[in-house]
Amino acid sequence: GVLYRWRQRSERWRLELLKERIRRDGKVKGTDVLKVDSFLNHQMDVELFAEIGKEFKRRFAGCEINKILTIEASGIGIACVVAQYFHCPVIFAKKTQTKNIAGEVYTSKVESFTHGRVYDIIVAKEFLGPGDKVLLIDDFLANGAALEGLAQLVKDAGAELVGAGIVIEKAFQPGGDRLRAKGLRIEALARVQSMNEETGVTFADD
């Protein structure tokens, strides 16, 4: 009854808080660039991150999770705050362009559409292995290359991939649909349907 309605209200409030912040402080460039560096991935609003963490905890409440995996650099801040609600450590995959990578790491390739280059991401084998139940966390999902690279590391480690928590998904780009079609559970808090410099951001559930 009352408690259920209160919970529903607090859940909606968290999502509205995030969407309102994107509308207010996000800067749209063209039709596909959304800059949220004033609160998400350069300067970070940790109180907002806490609400995001609570929402991911709610969505993955029934899941056993003992590791959170993200990618450097912009995923680290959000992953650390989220991890407090799951009471587990955070691992961040390191980007490297070194050719001679030691054998004590899992490695995967990621194509950066922003920078137009391919790089390797690595995680030390001592931190990820069979028996681990992993939640991926990242700030953005667009083409899905980073998420795919992280998922490959989990697979190579023989660990279980529980799902992915994404703060902002560009729903008009193919990554989310492609990865969901492969069976990955993706929980995206704000799904952007379209954007332009005049009208700003339109969300998928508006």
Predicted feature locations:
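Short Gly/Thr/Asp-enriched flexible loops that form oxyanion-binding sites at enzyme active sites
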Residues: G77-F86
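PRPP-dependent phosphoribosyltransferase catalytic core
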Residues: Y4-R14, E20-R21, D32, A151-D206
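Short, glycine/charge-rich flexible loops or terminal/linker lids adjacent to PRPP-binding catalytic cores
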Residues: C88-V134, G200-D205
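Active-site/ligand-binding-proximal alpha/beta "capping" segment
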Residues: P130, D138-D156
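Active-site-facing substrate-recognition patch
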Residues: Y4-I65
